Every structure is written in structure tokens, then in C-alpha cells.
């Protein structure tokens, strides 16, 4: 209950509402903003644009928000169905980002999670066993190297560990508690004011 974690589950929140709430929270000090996930957000209320243009607007707005508040913004994104229909290797690529190339352009880093076993692949290209493994693919890194890191994936716990890490039985693991405070349950977080929907996203 003392953790500084704020959860906002407003359905189809738009970029203007999000920015207004983040600005309020910034006065109390925030270190990270996580969007889960980008395609669930809505853009401006203007009509006439398609979904790809709307996602592009959201992506640019999140980039502007990160710069304005000087905090990292992690935005989860869906992948295109083309990954599943593609023959051969199913490893995700930048072109698989759904509905917008703007995500690739705006992001400083793009990281994919890939589990070969999910697609029925049991052997990696180098001949190593792919079962129970996952890859963290750094597909874009504006400030560093592009590389892939292999991890162990424990499907029973939906947990990632280092490949050579010793796995403890569940009863031996330290109890973990999750704390959160909900933005929408705190009437004072926006000072009783509604965000201005006519404000520019960035």
C-alpha cells in the first residue's frame, strides 16, 4: 500500500487524458510510464482518419510525453497476424509491428519477446534445444547495440530466468506481494478537473 504505483484502467483512454494525468502525477514524482497496450488507446476525436493514422498520432504523442516529463515510456504493442502466417522462422521483425510504421520510427528501443515453442518449434537454427527457452530480441536501439538474449521460460509460472540459473521450487521462493494504488479511485489525482480534450498531444 506504500508503493508508488498508480494504475489507471480507463477504457479507450486517449492521449490527451493520459497526458493530463501524467502531468498531475509528475508533480509528485514519477520515474516510469507503462502503456498496456498501445492499440487500446484512442487518438484525437477528429473524424476522417484511419486507424493507422490514429496509432501514428498516439505514438508521436507518447514520444512527446516522454520528452516533456523526462521519463521513459514503455508502450506494449500488438504484432501483425503476418507473423503466424509466415512460413519458416516466426521470429518477429520490425515490420510486424501492427498498424503503424510510426512506432518503429518514434521508439528509441524496440524489444520483442519470442518463444519458438509457442509455434511448435523445438530446435533453434544452431541446433540447440528450443524447448523451455525464450529470446529477448533488441530489434532497435538508438543508443546501443542490437542483439538477442536467450533465457529460460518457466511456463508454469510465466517466469523468465537466466539459462544457467538454478530454479527453486515454488515453496522455496520468497513470497511476493503486489501493491498498487488506482488513479481512478483517487478523486484528487486530477484535482476534480476533467482533462482538456482540445489540447494538443505534444
Describe the role of every protein-language-model region.
Residues 51-52, 90:
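A generic secondary-structure micro-motif detector
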Residues 15-30, 60-69, 82-202:
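C-terminal regions of RecA-like/P-loop NTPase motor modules
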Residues 1-50, 57, 64, 85:
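Conserved inter-motif catalytic segment of the P-loop NTP-binding fold
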Residues 76-78:
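Conserved H-loop
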Residues 54-55, 93:
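Charged, low-complexity surface patches
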Amino acid at each position: 500500500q506504500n508503493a508508488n504505483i498508480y494504475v489507471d484502467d480507463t477504457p479507450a483512454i486517449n492521449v490527451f487524458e493520459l497526458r493530463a494525468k501524467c502531468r498531475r502525477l509528475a508533480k509528485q514524482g514519477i520515474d516510469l510510464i507503462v502503456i498496456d497496450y498501445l492499440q487500446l488507446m484512442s487518438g484525437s476525436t477528429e473524424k476522417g482518419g484511419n486507424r493507422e493514422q490514429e496509432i501514428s498520432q498516439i505514438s508521436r504523442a507518447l514520444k512527446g510525453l516522454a520528452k516533456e516529463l523526462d521519463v521513459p515510456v514503455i508502450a506494449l504493442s500488438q504484432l501483425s497476424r503476418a507473423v503466424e502466417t509466415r512460413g519458416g522462422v516466426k521470429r518477429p521483425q520490425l515490420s510486424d509491428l501492427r498498424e503503424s510504421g510510426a512506432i518503429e520510427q518514434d521508439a528509441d528501443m524496440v524489444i520483442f519477446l519470442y518463444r519458438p515453442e509457442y509455434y511448435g518449434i523445438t530446435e533453434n537454427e544452431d541446433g540447440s534445444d528450443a524447448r523451455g527457452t525464450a529470446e529477448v530480441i533488441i530489434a532497435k536501439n538508438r543508443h546501443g547495440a542490437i542483439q538477442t538474449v536467450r533465457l529460460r521460460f518457466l511456463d508454469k509460472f510465466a517466469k523468465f530466468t537466466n539459462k544457467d540459473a538454478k530454479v527453486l521450487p515454488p515453496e522455496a521462493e520468497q513470497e511476493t506481494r503486489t501493491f498498487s494504488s488506482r488513479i481512478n479511485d483517487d478523486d484528487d489525482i486530477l484535482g476534480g478537473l476533467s482533462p482538456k480534450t482540445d489540447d494538443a498531444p505534444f
